[in-house]
């Protein structure tokens, strides 16, 4: 894309450079468009925001980087994403946005170079409708490990006709939802294997905890609103609709889903860790981390790089920008809802997202957050193969079909790591 050098000889606005942000989060598109306009009005610097469709970010980024007007601000998901794009990542170690981080842990490093800046910290687990749980005769305090969760879920299933609801929302394996299982749920066996082996990355996963992965997947799909054979066509929106309508008690998702489900009422919402039956999991918290790192395109013009770094600094420090990013209801200048993110920046605002505050409470209570190790999964192909195998298994739950999940997980990891040169 565009070459190095200044934009001398162009009109005054060109000298300021411009920003092209390729946004990863479709659910925040409207807010980013509004912030871009505000920044442009304040500074005269043009900011273009393009949002990739769900699950299409890498494909879109590759396509856009091949154009003459390519993104100046893009994102990677962590070490694996960085490996593909490190030649495009400018060093951000001297930038204001880097200085605004509360911890080095939120910077993505490539040797000594700061290649990416984490801009949102998120947590996920099992979101719970406490009102329905109480109607079934239980409270959150009754669920401290996998055995407890299984007992409660199976009891709800046994009484579903009497209760009028199910234990879990549909575990949709359509492209809008399958990431919750092939990536987020799959993080748990990876996390526990890394913990057991004292590592934070590997070219060859052993699959030590895949029996645990199977038992939580079995629990999800056999105690839900939907016949497991129908999961391939179930969407993320289906799961939201089921949860909001009070058709299920439990819904695996994260803090980012708050605005989708807030109509259930804060007093009725809780969040549980994803228990998979590992010793000591009573001390486990939610899965907390980031796979959202901002990177600045090193191949953009100097003026555009400077403009982009200035835009990032504004996002991390400006009151209006931070309110839009951290706030929820009515937080945008237009009166629309904000993004509801937690940022790792010094000026982060306290959230009015209940799920974020629940995540913070787990930490305050001394529970150990589960780190996001799915950023070390070797490729999208690996995730897709695991997802396909999970879907096949759901429709016919045989040991032979689970062996296909194990094969995709273990052999697929080695194959994809080798292919990526990781």
Say what each PLM segment does.
Residues 153-154, 199-233:
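Glycine-centered hinge/linker elements that transmit conformational signals in sensory
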Residues 91-105, 168, 172-175, 190-215, ...:
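Short, solvent-exposed loop/beta-turn-alpha elements that line the ligand-binding surface or hinge
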